[in-house]
Curated annotation (Swiss-Prot):
Protein name per its UniProtKB record: Enolase
Binding site for Mg(2+): D246, E291, D318
Annotated family: Belongs to the enolase family.
Organism field: Aeromonas salmonicida (strain A449)
Alphabetical keyword list: Cytoplasm, Glycolysis, Lyase, Magnesium, Metal-binding, Secreted
Length: 433
């Protein structure tokens, strides 16, 4: 019933109007799984390769026909007759067939789409929801939790066309008792933020991840207007709502000069000075999590930042670790950061993603499940967050259906699981338990 009889790939469109790979895996029992690969804007240099055609006459070079050739050709042929329930074997076949360190032959976008579609097909064959199947693959059958959302309500950096250097300013509805209540609180702050921005004459157009993208006087002003919105929504900052930031600092790091250049503010920092700048912000605002607070190659700087802030703040590695167990192990061994961002297209398969989550948890690091700035209606990360009991999720703001699709799937899962999937709020954040 769970043998693969057909694998199909197609080119679909993501939330930025760019092509991406969607795959279907068909099983002999008539079960079908379908999944799409997301795409990042601020990407780590050590991520698995997203294969694009480079043909400027199609989609400005961003077509994925080469990746589809891999899905519909060698991958489909290699997987015929294989048992979809053996996810590790399915993923390993594709990895071995590709034969490169960074999946550059077939593309991580090709391998991941098939990997996730396979998991969905296997879940269907087993007659269980995807999150339950993921929990079994993870070796934690029946262990679930609802993740605390990090909601990106002001977008800057590579996610917006504005003067804000820091890429994401997020709220966490820690005062909520359930995921559904957290979503409501986030929506209320989001709508009040629109009012606050309008009252100041600021633009309320949104960026790639559905957050507002106004020009602001400083990065600190982003936190100030969010604080106003939280109060206007009737919530207490630091009690009901905490704050988080994704600096994506590699995007404003000058490797030659070894400087961090906040062009929007006209300020330049050394590595330790930028960590001190962030530390100062944490004394003025209830910031409990900082992601990619330095360049991905600035390991000495991260050691300093972790030492200075790591006992009270969650220090998340995204570009730093790129969901890669080899790089994460180096971080763990050297006391770098205390949390990893999980993006399965950075590594390119479900099995490798689960391995990164397990390694992080075993080392006492937290794992934050994340979307990419280029998304589709595919909501697999919601099931991944619940099925691994990861505890935290980043999936954008309260607008754009590519973001809201994940929140809606979480609401459905919470309704189905009830007390079996507790919402632990701030306890999930490193340094806050």
């Amino acid at each position: 019933m769970s043998k693969i009889v057909k694998v199909i790939g197609r080119e679909i469109i993501d939330s930025r109007g760019n092509p991406t790979v969607e795959a279907e895996v068909h099983l002999e029992g008539g079960f079908v799984g379908m999944a799409a690969a997301p795409s990042g804007a601020s990407t780590g240099s050590r991520e698995a390769l997203e294969l694009r055609d480079g043909d400027k006459s199609r989609f400005l070079g961003k077509g994925v026909l080469k990746a589809l050739e891999a899905v519909n050709g060698p991958i489909a042929q290699a997987l015929l007759g294989k048992d979809a329930k053996d996810q590790a074997a399915i993923d390993q076949i594709m990895i071995d067939l590709d034969g490169t360190e960074n999946k550059s032959k077939f593309g991580a976008n090709a391998i991941l789409a098939v990997s996730l579609a396979n998991a969905k097909a296997a879940a269907a064959a087993k007659g269980m929801p995807l999150y339950a199947h993921i929990a079994e693959l993870n070796g934690t059958a029946g262990v679930y939790s609802m993740p605390l959302p990090m909601m990106n309500i002001i977008n800057g950096g590579e996610h917006a066309d504005n003067n804000v250097d820091i890429q994401e300013f997020m709220i966490q509805p820690v005062g909520a008792k359930t995921l559904k209540e957290a979503v409501r609180m986030g929506a209320e702050v989001f709508h009040n933020l629109a009012k606050v921005l309008k009252s100041k004459g600021y633009n309320t157009a949104v960026g790639d991840e559905g957050g507002f993208a106004p020009n602001l006087k400083s990065n600190a002003e982003a936190l100030e207007v969010i604080a106003e919105a939280v109060a206007a929504a009737g919530y207490v900052l630091g009690k009901d709502i905490t704050l988080a930031m994704d600096c994506a600092a590699s995007e404003f790091y000058d490797a030659e000069k070894k400087e961090y250049n906040l062009k929007g503010e006209g300020r330049i920092f050394t590595s330790n000075e930028f960590s001190d700048y962030l530390a100062d912000l944490t004394t003025k605002f209830p910031i409990v999590s900082i992601e990619d607070g330095l360049d991905e190659s600035d390991w000495d700087g991260f050691a300093y930042q972790t030492k200075e802030l790591g006992k009270k703040i969650q220090i998340v590695g995204d570009d730093l670790f790129v969901t890669n167990t080899k790089i994460l192990k180096r971080g763990i061994d050297n006391g770098i950061a205390n949390s990893i961002l999980i993006k399965f297209n950075q590594i390119g398969s479900l099995t490798e993603t689960l391995a990164a989550i397990k390694m992080a948890k075993d080392a006492g690091y937290t794992a934050v499940i994340s979307h990419r700035s280029g998304e589709t209606e595919d909501a697999t990360i919601a099931d991944l967050a619940v099925g691994t009991a990861a505890g935290q999720i980043k999936t954008g703001s309260m607008s754009r259906s590519d973001r809201v699709a994940k929140y809606n799937q979480l609401i459905r899962i919470e309704e189905a699981l009830g007390a079996k999937a507790p919402f632990n709020g701030l306890k999930e954040v490193k340094g806050q338990a």
